[in-house]
UniProtKB/Swiss-Prot annotation:
It is found in: Secreted, Extracellular space, Apoplast. Keywords: Apoplast, Disulfide bond, Glycoprotein, Secreted, Stress response. This is 33.0 kDa cold shock protein. Belongs to the thaumatin family. Homooligomer; disulfide-linked. Induction: By cold shock. It comes from the Eukaryota.
Length: 24
């Protein structure tokens, strides 16, 4: 849940579960 607008582009590098949770 530490995905920010700046990390939005790098969210793909993070675990899908965490990325999805932050995106949801």
């Amino acid at each position: 849940a530490q995905i920010t607008l700046t990390n939005k582009a790098s969210y793909t590098v993070t675990p899908p579960a965490q990325a999805n949770a932050a995106d949801a």
